[in-house]
Amino acid sequence: MQPRRIARELALLSLSQLPAKAEPPSDQMLSELLLAATRTLAAEARDHLEAASAELKQSSDRLLLSTLGSADLESSRAMLQEVIEMAQAAINRTGNALDLPEWVQLTDREEVRKFGGRLVLQVSNNRERIDRTLNDVMVDWQLHRVPRLDQDILRLAAAEILFLGTPEQVAINEAVELANRYSDEEGRRFINGVLRRLSTMLGKAARAARPSS
């Protein structure tokens, strides 16, 4: 698991706790935000395990019912397929839950908290410029109309590109990973498109700034 990927998720969860137009957080407030984000991940792990347990019990009950009560072969097959799908969902949830403790453990590493805090501060300190830049590359839309978590995913990626020197493709890929966890398919495509237009705009600006030969 990449420490910086975890740091980005902590930063996203931390930003979601800040008011829309908050002042940059103090060191103490930043530590509290990161701690709250860590607790959110731990709670998510517990929720995944509880949901997986419930789905396994439900699939077990359905399997027992199919064994005892099916009147014909077709009904048995349909019920068995339903049981298989329930079991697969439970397995997937369990896999996600087993990944999360590693994330929670890594959040205690200094490099993770340091980079996560740095991301939060860059977004907070440069909010106006970041929002203005993102609005410039949106087509017939404005950032304030986008769901809050999607806004913050875009801001984090823009902050990395504009202020931290993260390669544009890396920042875009990491933003899409966050969108896979915290947005829907439409949001993921939107985030990817906005950031690619940002990359194109920055590339054109860089080429225009080069001295002519």
UniProtKB/Swiss-Prot annotation:
Organism the protein comes from: Synechococcus elongatus (strain ATCC 33912 / PCC 7942 / FACHB-805) (Anacystis nidulans R2)
Matching InterPro entries: NusB-like_sf, NusB_fam, NusB_RsmB_TIM44
Family membership noted in the UniProt record:
Belongs to the NusB family.
State the function annotated in the UniProt record.
Involved in transcription antitermination. Required for transcription of ribosomal RNA (rRNA) genes. Binds specifically to the boxA antiterminator sequence of the ribosomal RNA (rrn) operons.
Write out the GO MF terms: RNA binding
Record key words, sorted: RNA-binding, Transcription, Transcription antitermination, Transcription regulation
**GO terms classed as biological process:** DNA-templated transcription termination; transcription antitermination
Protein name from the UniProt record = Transcription antitermination protein NusB
Q: What is the lineage of its organism?
A: Bacteria, Bacillati, Cyanobacteriota, Cyanophyceae, Synechococcales
For this record, the Gene Ontology CC terms, alphabetical, are:
cytosol
